[in-house]
């Protein structure tokens, strides 16, 4: 099968720094190539895959994602649309797999080529909903209709894991109110347990007026800034802490923790109850008190169960097979 995979335009694939969705797209392209498919990745400069890569204009670097998030012109994908139109005028593919935010080509030319559209967020009114694929069951239910879902997958054959944990729990996320690092810090203070907080500062006001003062009050909590990759950070951490205060559809870092044999302590928001098996691979919590209790009980979770669950449910090969099935349905003319 000849597959055009269209990535996002605001970061390279694989990403530089923060970029969960770009890591997912890269894992998918590599697995598809290994399974014998011809893959063409359309993505910004510095992107690459084991198949063929077609570079397209990146989003304006002078207006980074964090600066425009929430604006009406969040991402101008017209240059991506023009690049896709020019490419498809001269080359044929069997199916388009579109991970972009606006899906402009398939919206404007729905009969041109069979397509599948993946989303990592709850799409707004202007987003494409035909042949839409969510990241999990809860995400699909939120979108409604006939939306399908495919779980993200990781290259587990290359993913290091460690059963013996020697480092404190770690909270990994960009520093923003909806990621609620302050709840993790308060839980650490209540449990009197150490904590590492990692992530780039997206919301300066939240960091300066909420997170930083708590760090002053909690000497056992260490902020280390943005990390280049999650594997080393998660390898020996006794737990991953996640405290989303929004519908976090299917956070990739949770799968990365499980692949590292690292238990997860998380608020039961969005897709997290689908990812974490309470009492088996971690604990699902509802407030600071239950987060603190879970931090005190993390030794009850067997890291081997975390790794086994990742292997059973979240491999890149399983993700690729599930998507190939949807590609075949789209090729057969099915619409959902």
What are these regions (language model features)?
Residues 235-249, 262:
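Acidic donor-binding loop of glycosyltransferase active sites
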Residues 116-160, 164-168, 222:
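Donor nucleotide-sugar binding/catalytic pocket of nucleotide-sugar-dependent glycosyltransferases
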Residues 268-279, 283-286:
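Short acidic/histidine- and often glycine-rich active-site loop of Leloir-type glycosyltransferases
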Residues 144-198:
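Conserved donor-binding/catalytic core segment of Leloir-type glycosyltransferases
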Residues 199, 208-227:
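Nucleotide-activated donor-binding/catalytic signature segment of Leloir-type glycosyltransferases, i.e.
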Residues 259, 263-266, 276:
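Short hydrophobic beta-strand element within catalytic cores of glycosyltransferases
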Residues 35, 74-79, 299-336:
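A charged, aromatic-enriched C-terminal amphipathic alpha-helix characteristic of glycosyltransferases
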Residues 283-304:
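C-terminal "capping" alpha-helix adjacent to the active site of nucleotide-linked donor transferases
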């Amino acid at each position: 099968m000849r597959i055009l995979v269209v990535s996002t335009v605001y970061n390279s694939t694989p990403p530089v720094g923060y970029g969960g969705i770009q890591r997912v797209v890269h894992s998918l392209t590599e697995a598809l190539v290994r399974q014998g498919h011809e893959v063409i990745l359309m993505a910004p400069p510095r992107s690459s895959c084991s198949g063929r890569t077609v570079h397209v204009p990146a989003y304006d670097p002078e207006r980074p994602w964090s600066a425009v998030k929430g604006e009406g012109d969040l991402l101008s994908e017209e240059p991506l649309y023009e690049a896709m139109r020019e490419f498809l005028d001269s080359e044929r593919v069997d199916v388009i797999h579109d991970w972009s935010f606006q899906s402009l080509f398939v919206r404007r030319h729905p009969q041109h080529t069979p397509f599948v559209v993946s989303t990592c967020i709850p799409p707004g009114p202007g987003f494409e909903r035909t042949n839409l694929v969510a990241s999990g069951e809860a995400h699909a239910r939120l979108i409604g209709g006939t939306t399908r879902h495919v779980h993200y997958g990781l290259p587990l054959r290359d993913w290091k894991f460690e059963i013996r944990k020697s480092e404190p729990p770690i909270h990994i996320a960009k520093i923003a109110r909806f990621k609620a690092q302050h709840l993790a810090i308060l839980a650490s203070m209540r449990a009197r347990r150490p904590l590492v907080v990692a992530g780039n500062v997206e919301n300066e006001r939240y960091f300066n007026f909420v997170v930083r003062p708590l760090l002053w009050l909690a000497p056992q909590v260490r902020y280390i800034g943005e990390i280049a990759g999650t594997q080393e950070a998660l390898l020996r951490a006794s737990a991953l802490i996640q405290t989303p205060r929004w519908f976090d559809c299917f956070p990739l870092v949770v799968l990365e923790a499980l692949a590292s044999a690292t238990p997860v302590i998380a608020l039961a928001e969005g897709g997290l109850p689908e990812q974490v098996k309470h009492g088996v691979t971690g604990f699902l919590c509802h407030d600071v008190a239950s987060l603190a209790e879970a931090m005190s009980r993390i030794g009850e979770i067997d890291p081997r169960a975390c790794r086994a669950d990742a292997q059973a449910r979240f491999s890149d090969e399983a993700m690729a097979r599930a998507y190939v099935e949807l590609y075949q349905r789209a090729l057969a003319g099915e619409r959902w």
